[in-house]
Curated annotation (Swiss-Prot):
Location of region: Head of neuraminidase: 71-449
Enzyme Commission number(s) from the entry: 3.2.1.18
Protein name: Neuraminidase
HAMAP family (UniProt xref): INFV_NRAM
Length: 449
């Protein structure tokens, strides 16, 4: 092959390679264009679907929690959540809290709690045994999660609180201020909507558990006055965060604090704490017009702490060991009652659920079911009720649930702080089991040594 032929051959090969490369580039461009066109088309097609979904979510996100159903029939209690906040807080950033409670909308359940403006295992946790301080705030996080700065949202400045959802927005009630002039601040969807001033100037206080909503109205009970004598008690009816009606209970010789309230067939039942002279629990039930009835749980299975050994009950206050008390709850079923109580008669330890089929009206101490929740060797604390509406569960009844606070630290343990974790259970009509679900943290922490 002479030099000219070599040049022609090499040139031809280069030309072929160039043409092939050009065709590949053109093909690549066409492929990208087609792919982009398809994606763009899909995006255009998806936009109406996305908008429809968004609008649909907004439409179903606003309902009315009717509260007209009856409580679901149940045979026992299934464990619902456990946050392990103290165990996690030995190493992680977890709030120092007390008075946790749970409330559910038609979309979710949240744990509400009163912080001390401090984290566990930190210097600011010192002295947090104190109930009322300007640093306490109501916050909330998804149920079952340890309350931390990373998953919690601020709700209100408060050392006493309540919260509930009417199907449209969250209502929060936060009480703060001096003992002789505290004010409850009502917020609806995070916006201040109303206030309630202390009317007896003696530690205005509320439920420390969820308020109750029926047909768009929400209801709460507040106390103002002595913790060891006759005080004043009011029921408030609120709509979209504004007080529309209130009534003061005519209840001589009764003492109501820290009521646990729930809806049942369109009415509200509250089971409360008698800190004055009752080792059984007082109750108040009322309709949406605030027409009310009052009484004490008659059962000889006593629900408060401290309390005497079970015996003969009374439909009035049972005086032995009646002074002082602890927040608690019960669920009424006709003449029967599910009673939640500490296992110990004189300390906040252990927890159990008891079914007394005649206990709402009968004074004997017989019962037919006992389910263990926390062993007597482990600390418990406050407890309270909450419900899950049919709009959340899909059932045709209101599911009863409860939570138990598991207090750790002062005054019973050698720490500089007081805090707690929580567990919760919901009523079911299927198999359940009794056991012990304690807090489980090993104390003291590093900050305590």
């Amino acid at each position: 092959m002479n030099p000219n032929q070599k040049i022609i051959t090499i040139g031809s090969i280069c030309m072929v390679i160039g043409i092939v490369s050009l065709m590949l580039q053109i093909g690549n461009i066409i492929s990208i264009w087609v792919s982009h066109s398809i994606q763009t088309g899909n995006q255009h097609q998806a936009e109406p679907i996305g908008n429809t979904n968004f609008l649909t979510e907004k439409a179903v996100a606003s309902v009315t929690l009717a509260g007209n159903s009856s409580l679901c029939p149940i045979s026992g209690w299934a464990v619902h959540s456990k946050d392990n906040g103290i165990r996690i807080g030995s190493k992680g950033d977890v709030f120092v809290i007390r008075e946790p409670f749970i409330s559910c909308s038609h979309l979710e359940c949240r744990t509400f709690f009163l912080t001390q403006g401090a984290l566990l295992n930190d210097k600011h946790s010192n002295g947090t045994v104190k109930d009322r301080s300007p640093h306490r705030t109501l916050m909330s996080c998804p149920v079952g999660e340890a309350p931390s700065p990373y998953n919690s949202r601020f709700e209100s400045v408060a050392w006493s609180a309540s919260a509930c959802h009417d199907g449209t927005s969250w209502l929060t009630i936060g009480i703060s201020g001096p003992d002789n002039g505290a004010v409850a601040v009502l917020k609806y969807n995070g916006i201040i909507t109303d206030t309630i001033k202390s009317w007896r100037n003696n530690i205005l206080r509320t439920q420390e558990s969820e308020c109750a909503c029926v047909n768009g109205s929400c209801f709460t009970v507040m106390t103002d006055g002595p913790s060891n004598g006759q005080a004043s008690y009011k029921i408030f009816k609120m709509e979209k965060g504004k007080v529309v009606k209130s009534v003061e209970l005519d209840a001589p010789n009764y003492h109501y604090e820290e009521c646990s309230c729930y809806p049942d067939a369109g009415e509200i039942t509250c089971v409360c704490r008698d800190n004055w002279h009752g080792s059984n629990r007082p109750w108040v039930s009322f309709n949406q017009n605030l027409e009310y009835q009052i009484g004490y749980i008659c059962s000889g299975v006593f629900g408060d702490n401290p309390r005497p050994n079970d015996g003969t009950g009374s439909c009035g206050p049972v005086s032995p060991n009646g002074a002082y008390g602890v927040k608690g709850f019960s669920f009424k079923y006709g003449n029967g009652v599910w009673i939640g109580r500490t296992k110990s008669t004189n300390s906040r330890s252990g927890f159990e659920m008891i079914w007394d089929p005649n206990g709402w009206t009968g004074t004997d101490s017989s019962f037919s079911v006992k389910q263990d929740i926390v062993a007597i060797t482990d600390w418990s604390g406050y407890s309270g009720s909450f419900v899950q509406h049919p709009e959340l569960t899909g059932l045709d009844c209101i599911r009863p649930c409860f939570w138990v606070e598991l207090i750790r630290g002062r005054p019973k343990e050698s720490t500089i702080w007081t805090s707690g974790s929580s567990i919760s259970f919901c009523g079911v009509n299927s198999d359940t089991v009794g056991w012990s679900w304690p807090d489980g943290a090993e104390l003291p922490f590093t900050i305590d040594k």
